[in-house]
């Protein structure tokens, strides 16, 4: 009995990253030997993602309300520089995708469009959807995982409770601590969940279906790698004036890996919150910036929209001049920030970008169909970039503020 408990203690206190890597390897091996067995363990991945998605809305709501209600007067939250970093990073991602797509133009083999999908008719519709999400019923926002609405109501409740009795504030602080403990337990189950996700993905696709889109994937993944390993570190260096790679690589390892396999920014919010706590960041800052980042920090989505749109443009033989390319970068960045306000995310915003070049909706929807074919890898890489960048920029802004205060 004692031996069993010591084994469980070792598993509970062991390196989570190492356990996740073992889970990935085990999933690949199982799918290679038996696809049927791999499909049988798919429920482990679904359970893990379901648990994260279930806890994330209430975690965000309570953390935001608690941190604002318990905020001391004259406390710096550093939100403005973080939002600026989010928006600049998204635009830089779109610009990188434009440059890479120009150097390596890609031809698409267009397939049938996706039936039953209705892309937004313009940027106005995307903004309209976001505004209505802002004033969603708070209970409905929690039930549907509408993080824009959850943030709005959490901030509102926090401000309302700012002048409440200390005992009331303490209740929210205790609830916040309790939910954080539950999140830690769920995150410890990541190796089992990722084992199920990897096994199911390899068993169902085998990645054979996406082999024909190798160049398109290469351009997409290269753009994301450039942002993750060159542009983001450069932005962080400008902010903190020291080697950015220890921070960047840690965030990619501890946030990006999980996000890659869950393929959900919402499901990765608890993981990012736990990482921010490990990095000793200001709780008042990250409790707001992380869920906000899951909504508006969409560098990966900007890359997807830009690369697929320019692939369609090149396939149709349309010439792109520099001003149009810059305009596409702006439209892709703004659209990407609204990706959370569109069912289907970044892929269904492609017709919006295609309309800049006079590409018909029928052809644009065929481009979306290509996006769905490569979606297994594209969506995973996009989420990993988006989610890890949330922590990177939050940490950079917090450290820059601390350095400024020391020089003070």
From Swiss-Prot:
InterPro entries: Na-dicarboxylate_symporter, Na:dicarbo_symporter_sf, Ser_Thr_transp_SstT. It comes from Shewanella sp. (strain W3-18-1). This is Serine/threonine transporter SstT. One of its GO terms (molecular function) is neutral L-amino acid:sodium symporter activity. Keywords: Amino-acid transport, Cell inner membrane, Cell membrane, Membrane, Symport, Transmembrane, Transmembrane helix, Transport. The chain crosses the membrane at residues 11-31, 43-63, 81-101, 141-161, 192-212, 216-236, 298-318, 330-350, 357-377. SUPFAM superfamilies: Proton glutamate symport protein. One of its GO terms (cellular component) is plasma membrane. Gene3D superfamilies: Sodium:dicarboxylate symporter. Belongs to the dicarboxylate/amino acid:cation symporter (DAACS) (TC 2.A.23) family. It is a multi-pass membrane protein. Signal peptide: none annotated. The gene is sstT.
């Amino acid at each position: 009995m004692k031996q069993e408990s010591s084994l469980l203690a070792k598993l509970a206190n062991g390196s989570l990253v190492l356990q996740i890597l073992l889970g990935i390897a085990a999933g690949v091996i199982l799918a290679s030997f038996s696809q049927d067995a791999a499909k049988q363990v798919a429920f482990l991945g679904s359970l893990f993602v379901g648990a994260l998605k279930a806890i994330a809305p209430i975690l965000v709501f309570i953390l935001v309300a608690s941190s604002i209600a318990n905020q001391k007067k004259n406390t710096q939250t550093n939100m403005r520089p973080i939002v600026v970093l989010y928006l600049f990073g998204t635009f830089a991602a779109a610009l990188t995708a434009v440059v890479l797509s120009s150097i390596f133009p890609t031809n698409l083999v267009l397939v049938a469009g996706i039936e039953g999908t209705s892309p937004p008719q313009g940027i106005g519709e995307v903004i309209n959807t976001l505004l209505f999400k802002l004033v969603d019923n708070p209970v409905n926002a929690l039930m549907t995982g509408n993080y824009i609405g959850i943030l709005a109501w959490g901030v509102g409740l926090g401000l309302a409770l700012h002048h409440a009795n200390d005992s009331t504030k303490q209740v929210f602080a205790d609830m916040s601590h309790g939910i954080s403990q539950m999140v830690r337990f769920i995150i410890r189950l990541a190796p089992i969940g990722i084992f199920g996700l990897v096994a199911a993905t390899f068993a169902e696709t085998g990645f054979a279906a996406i082999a024909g889109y190798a160049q398109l994937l290469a351009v997409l993944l290269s753009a994301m790698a450039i942002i993750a390993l060159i542009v983001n570190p450069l932005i962080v260096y400008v902010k903190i004036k020291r080697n950015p790679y220890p921070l960047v690589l840690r965030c990619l390892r501890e946030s990006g890996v999980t996000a890659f396999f869950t393929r959900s920014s919402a499901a990765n919010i608890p993981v990012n919150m736990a990482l921010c706590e490990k990095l000793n960041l200001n709780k008042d800052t990250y409790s707001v910036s992380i869920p906000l980042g899951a909504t508006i920090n969409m560098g990966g989505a900007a890359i997807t929209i830009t690369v697929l749109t320019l692939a369609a443009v090149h396939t149709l033989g349309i010439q792109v001049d520099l001003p149009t390319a810059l305009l596409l970068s702006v439209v892709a960045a703004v659209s990407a920030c609204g990706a959370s306000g569109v069912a289907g995310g970044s892929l269904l915003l492609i017709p919006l970008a295609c309309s800049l070049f006079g590409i018909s909706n029928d052809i644009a929807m065929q481009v979306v169909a290509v996006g769905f074919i490569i979606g297994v890898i594209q969506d995973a890489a996009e989420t990993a970039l988006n989610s890890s960048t949330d922590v990177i920029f939050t940490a950079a802004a917090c450290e820059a503020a601390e350095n400024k205060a020391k020089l003070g």
